[in-house]
Structures are given as C-alpha cells and as structure tokens.
Design a protein with these regions (language model features):
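Extracytosolic ligand-binding ectodomains
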Residues: 4-10, 19-370
C-alpha cells in the first residue's frame, strides 16, 4: 500500500505541473517501464505526432491540445487510482484518455472515466473481459483479440493442416489465458480440437527447457507463444535449441524487439502476427505517404496511437464540441471516418474487428504470408 500511495502522490504532482494553461488535455495511459516499455513508447510517439499536427494547424475548435503521458503499471489497484486521479483534475479539461494499455481492473477504470465524462479510446484490440464493458464514451477502436485466433486458424488450415499445435500461455496473466482460450475455441469450432493443446509455463515451474522437451515429445510440430516478452523469448529459444526446425508463431507486439537480441539467428523462421497489413491497405496509403514525406515513420503501435487521436478529432468536429455526451452521440453515426476507412460502431466497437497479417521473419526481413 505504501508503494501505491507514493505512486499516487508522484502522479498528482506530475499532472498538476502540466495544468498551467487553459487548453484541453489528451492523456495517454501506457507503460513507461518493464516488459511493455516498447509498446508504451510506440503509442506515445503516435499520440504525440497526432497532437502536434492538430496544434500546428491552429488547434481544435479554437483550442490547443496539451499532452499528458501517464505510466500504466499494469497493476489492479494502481490502474483504478490512476483513473481516479485523472478524473478529479478540474483546473484543465482532460477530454480524452487513450488507454490504458493493460486490462487491469478494466471495468472499474472505465466506470471512473464514464462518471467523470471523459471520453476513452482503447487503441489496441481488446480481450473478452474488456469486450463486456460498455460505456457510451468508451471506444474499442480495433475490435477484439479473438480475430487473431480466426486469422491464425485460417492460415494454419491452408498451410499446416494436420500439424499438432501447442498453445503456451502464462497462467498468471488473464489476458494471455483469454487469448489462449480463443485459439482453442477456434479450433474446436472447426472440429479440430484434437490437434491443439494448451500448456502453461508453470507446469514445469518455468523450466523452459523441460517444457520445450515436453511439448515436442507430445508430438507438437508448432507452437503459438503467449505471455510476457520474457516468457515468449525464453520459450522460443528453448524450443529452437531442442529442434531448429520447430515452427513458432507469436504476436509481434507481445514479443517486442528483445526477441531478436535474445534468439539471434534462432529467430529466423518465426511467424509474427500483427494487426492488419500496412503495405496493401488503400485507406491508409495517403496518410502514410504524407507522414513519410514529412520524415515520420510508424513503428509498431505508433500507428494506433496516432489513429486514436485522429478518430477523436473527427468525432469532436462532428459534435462541434468537446463535451462527452455530444461527442459520444456521434459514435452511433452510420459512417465514422477513421485512418482505416469509414467504420460503423456498435457498443463502442467496430462491427468488423481489424484483421491480422502474418509475417515470416528471415535474415532481418519480414515476408508477408497472410
């Protein structure tokens, strides 16, 4: 509790130091340390770029936008305290919160923002628990993580049909376990439950070498790795040391760049799943070209941080107001402009979740295979 209290005091001082002007504020709640620091930095880069664009063009509805970056510590009690601290700031309007990145105490966090009438956008795909939370000013911009399971199965069925698949997850991480269950459910739906099996890191007390041996002795020829970046890179290395030809799939954002440093040449041949292919996306082409010409290159999740701000900007322009109720009302419009084309939203989520692309990594290059 002492640690939580000290964190809240530091957060309060950080927020108040940013509250010296009459502008409106956009807050990003994303990790600044530990396993998810890369994801946080990427989101920060995209959000800041979008805000800078708005301000350089004269602001929004006559106001400049201030940016406040808040650490998401991926902790249940701190997640709620962070939301409460942002909600009580009256000196300067916090009109939008992007995040949090982690799903800790998600329903409570969303409640806090809804009661404070602060619009909230989740810039990444959400899991089953988050999907159940519905608020009129809560946007799940990309839809649901079970889309990853659907796209994985489609590629598996066309390329590796018949291979036995190990899904290896972190039993202490609710999000990882929900993603694992989505994969199992997708195979069951298609009558292929016999070829997929769930393993968790704790069944061998996090002895990755023993788990790699068990997985392959069970006859599995490929694995989908879930969990923290540390879980993923350690498991991948042990699987490849046991058998260099073992097929590995994982989520590119979850694995992050530490994967390549840790595995070296053993990383070759890994399949990475990433939200929607960029190269052949006509809706994004104009935006990407414009930004590249200005010297800005998207990295990882930066595109989704940028897109969250632009989505909110479009809703504010439609509403001609920053007010929560007026902005929220336009989520029911038939066509909402996003960086991915016009979308229809239902209960704050797009009617069709963003799909995933699959890339095979080889010799420091990504080759799109799906």
């Amino acid at each position: 509790m002492r640690y939580v209290f000290l964190y809240i005091i530091c957060l309060f001082l950080t927020i108040n130091s940013a509250l010296a002007t009459p502008n409106v504020t956009v807050a990003l709640v994303a990790p600044k340390a530990e396993e998810y620091i890369q994801q946080g930095e990427e989101l920060n880069k995209g959000v800041k770029r979008a805000i800078d664009e708005i301000n350089n063009e004269g602001g929004l509805l006559g106001k400049k936008i201030d940016f406040l970056a808040v650490d998401d510590q991926c902790n249940d009690s701190i997640a709620v305290s962070t939301a409460q601290m942002l909600a009580v700031q009256k000196e300067k309007q916090i009109v939008l919160v992007i995040g949090p990145y982690c799903a800790n105490s998600f329903d409570q966090v969303a409640d806090v923002y809804a009661h404070a009438k602060i619009f909230q956008i989740i810039p990444t795909a959400v899991n089953y628990t988050q999907a159940k939370t519905i608020k009129k000013g809560l946007v799940k911009m990309l839809g649901y993580t079970n889309q990853e399971a659907k796209d994985f199965f489609n590629y598996y069925n066309s390329t590796f049909a018949g291979n036995k698949v190990a899904v290896i997850s972190n039993s202490n991480d609710a999000e990882s376990m929900e993603e694992a269950q989505a994969l199992i459910n997708e195979f069951q739906k298609h009558g292929k439950s016999v070829v997929i099996k769930l393993y968790t890191y704790d069944i061998t007390n996090k002895d990755y070498e023993a788990l790699a041996e068990l997985v392959q002795k069970d006859g599995n020829e490929m694995a989908f790795l879930l969990g923290t970046a540390k879980n993923i890179r350690k498991m991948a290395r042990r699987l490849r040391e046991y058998n260099e030809k073992f097929i590995i799939f994982t989520n590119k954002y979850a694995a992050n760049n530490s994967y390549f440093d840790y595995l070296g040449s053993l990383a070759d041949g890994t399949y990475f799943m990433e939200l929607r292919g960029r190269n052949d996306d006509p809706e994004l082409a104009e935006t990407l070209v414009k930004l590249r010409l200005s010297g800005f290159e998207f990295e990882g999740l930066s595109l989704y941080g940028y897109s969250a701000v632009k989505l909110w900007e479009n809703l504010v322009k439609k509403a001609k107001s920053f007010e929560y109720d007026k902005v929220s009302a336009h989520l029911n419009d038939k066509n909402i402009k996003t960086e991915f084309g016009n979308k229809m939203f239902h209960n704050g989520a797009p009617k069709v979740s963003e799909s995933y692309a699959i890339y095979r990594y080889e010799d420091e290059n990504y080759v799109k295979v799906y």
